[in-house]
């Protein structure tokens, strides 16, 4: 197999997005558009990948890191001009170069591989990825001769009436012989309505020089969708969401209502897990097998063990063990580690806490900046008082501790193994192992006080 290279065009300003965010960095199913493209082309066995950047170059470089080399297009003078900026990296290379736009997040490695194979089998100097659509307005048209061979590509604004009737369109993805590509770029003119240097003109240049120009028509037009505004962004989101949901269902995940379930492109979900409506799984989340998630649950960048149930709750940047029960209406905040067989019940908030195996906080509790041992029971209304208005402090609760209802643990404080804290206590000092700590005012009953009070009011 000859050397393979790729150029991703990501220099456009994206003015139609009307956004401060650089166009190709707008996310689709939680991942920037250009990252989707890079992830797919990286499966093609490339020797070099060059991303052409312009406006917002630093942000794109930060996103892609060392996966790609970069070339700067300081002025946006057209797609041919953009590709020519990669000459410093690729011009002297021999092989095949794939050119693709960074705003086509739905393209797949399979389609690009088919394009590369067509290019090789045809012995072509250039091969264009085309599609057939009923309403081709806005797209460049593929002009073929009487033998069906590609003659040229005409941009919509430059097309005559006959060419506008053509329904085979240019998707903006190409293969070129690398040396032929860079030799032809200097011959491209900007004598057109837009006054730009069009990459499709290279097709006509190579054809006129007697080279073979080929085309590969894809049946998957949705893969070629270019995102230029928020409407197209929403369309790409829907298509990608359906693709991700289908992949998970094929792999054994039950999704009760796919139209109302959102899974990020990088999430991994085990078989026999059930996702209820309103579930949103974001980032690099990993969910085990036999779990039940939702309804109306958000999980972001977290690891969820097997046989765990999360209902109507939010989990961010945390790790949950096996057979954990969360919710309804619980909030597990970042940097929390929840052990196995744990119960985090309704209206419980946990933040930056290690919560040991088989421990329970069943309702109405806040546990922050804490280390909770195994087999601990936190009664209703148990609170770790971790903040003094300036600094955060740690609470340590040992194994087998019982915390009574409506108790405050004022950090920094330690409740040692096996200790009990009486309901209604405010604990400000360490509690020794197996001690009972009572920190509340003694109850006083005033006999017949109510009758005396009522009689006093009548008089």
Curated annotation (Swiss-Prot):
Protein purpose: Catalyzes the last two sequential reactions in the de novo biosynthetic pathway for UDP-N-acetylglucosamine (UDP-GlcNAc). The C-terminal domain catalyzes the transfer of acetyl group from acetyl coenzyme A to glucosamine-1-phosphate (GlcN-1-P) to produce N-acetylglucosamine-1-phosphate (GlcNAc-1-P), which is converted into UDP-GlcNAc by the transfer of uridine 5-monophosphate (from uridine 5-triphosphate), a reaction catalyzed by the N-terminal domain.
GO CC, any one term: cytoplasm
First and last residue of the signal peptide: none
Stretch list, region Linker: 231-251
Assembly and binders: Homotrimer.
Catalytic residues (UniProt): 363 (proton acceptor)
HAMAP family: GlmU (MF_01631)
Predominant subcellular localization, coarse grouping: cytoplasm
Organism: Bacillus anthracis
GO molecular function, one term: glucosamine-1-phosphate N-acetyltransferase activity
Domain of life from the UniProt record: Bacteria
GO process annotations (BP): cell morphogenesis; cell wall organization; lipid A biosynthetic process; peptidoglycan biosynthetic process; regulation of cell shape; UDP-N-acetylglucosamine biosynthetic process
Name under which the protein is recorded: Bifunctional protein GlmU
Record keywords: Acyltransferase, Cell shape, Cell wall biogenesis/degradation, Cytoplasm, Magnesium, Metal-binding, Multifunctional enzyme, Nucleotidyltransferase, Peptidoglycan synthesis, Repeat, Transferase
Family annotation (PANTHER family): BIFUNCTIONAL PROTEIN GLMU, NUCLEOTIDYL TRANSFERASE
Binding residue positions for UDP-N-acetyl-alpha-D-glucosamine: 9-12, 23, 73, 78-79, 140, 155, 170, 228, 333, 351, 366, 377
E.C. no: 2.7.7.23, 2.3.1.157
Catalytic activity: alpha-D-glucosamine 1-phosphate + acetyl-CoA = N-acetyl-alpha-D-glucosamine 1-phosphate + CoA + H(+); N-acetyl-alpha-D-glucosamine 1-phosphate + UTP + H(+) = UDP-N-acetyl-alpha-D-glucosamine + diphosphate
Disulphide connectivity of cysteines: none
Keyword Phosphoprotein carried by entry: no
């Amino acid at each position: 197999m000859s050397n393979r290279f790729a150029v991703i065009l990501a220099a456009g300003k994206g003015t139609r997005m009307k956004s401060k965010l650089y166009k190709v960095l707008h996310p689709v199913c939680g991942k920037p558009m250009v990252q989707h493209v890079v992830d797919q082309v990286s499966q093609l066995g490339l020797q070099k990948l060059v991303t052409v950047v312009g406006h917002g170059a630093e942000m794109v470089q930060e996103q892609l890191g060392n996966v790609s080399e970069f070339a700067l297009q300081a002025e946006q003078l057209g797609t041919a001009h953009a590709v020519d900026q990669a000459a410093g990296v690729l011009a002297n290379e021999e092989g095949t170069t794939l050119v693709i736009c960074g705003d086509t997040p739905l393209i797949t490695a399979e389609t690009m591989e088919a394009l590369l194979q067509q290019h090789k089998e045809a012995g072509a100097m250039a091969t264009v990825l085309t599609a057939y659509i009923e309403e081709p307005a806005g797209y460049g048209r593929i002009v073929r001769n009487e033998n069906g061979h590609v003659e040229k590509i005409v941009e919509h604004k430059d097309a005559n009436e006959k060419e506008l009737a053509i329904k085979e369109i240019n998707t903006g993805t190409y293969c070129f012989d690398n040396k032929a590509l860079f030799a032809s770029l200097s011959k491209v003119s900007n004598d057109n309505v837009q006054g730009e240097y069009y990459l499709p003109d290279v097709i006509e240049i190579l054809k006129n020089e007697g080279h073979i120009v080929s085309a590969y028509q894809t049946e998957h037009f949705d893969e070629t969708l270019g995102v230029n505004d928020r409407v197209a962004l929403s369309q790409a989101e829907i298509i990608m969401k359906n693709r991700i949901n289908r992949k998970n269902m094929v792999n054994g995940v039950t999704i009760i209502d796919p139209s109302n379930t959102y899974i990020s492109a990088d999430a991994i979900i085990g078989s026999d897990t059930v996702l209820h409506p309103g579930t949103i799984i974001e980032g690099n989340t990993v969910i085990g097998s036999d779990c039940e998630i939702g309804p109306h649950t958000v999980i972001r960048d977290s690891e969820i063990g097997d046989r765990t149930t999360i209902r109507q709750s939010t989990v961010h940047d945390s790790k949950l063990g096996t057979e954990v029960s969360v919710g309804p209406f619980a909030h597990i905040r970042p940097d929390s580690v929840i052990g196995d067989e744990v119960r985090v019940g309704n209206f419980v908030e946990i933040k930056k806490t290690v919560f040991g195996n088989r421990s329970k906080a069943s309702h109405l509790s806040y546990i922050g900046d804490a280390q909770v041992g195994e087999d601990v029971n936190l009664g209703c209304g148990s609170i770790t008082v971790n903040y003094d208005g300036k600094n955060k402090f740690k609470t340590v609760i040992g194994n087998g501790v019982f915390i009574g209802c409506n108790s405050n643990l004022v950090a920094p404080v330690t409740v040692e193994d096996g200790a009990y804290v009486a309901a209604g206590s405010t604990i400000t000092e360490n509690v020794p192992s197996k001690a009972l700590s009572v920190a509340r005012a003694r109850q006083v009953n005033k006999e017949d006080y109510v009758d005396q009070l009522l009689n006093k009011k009548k008089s």
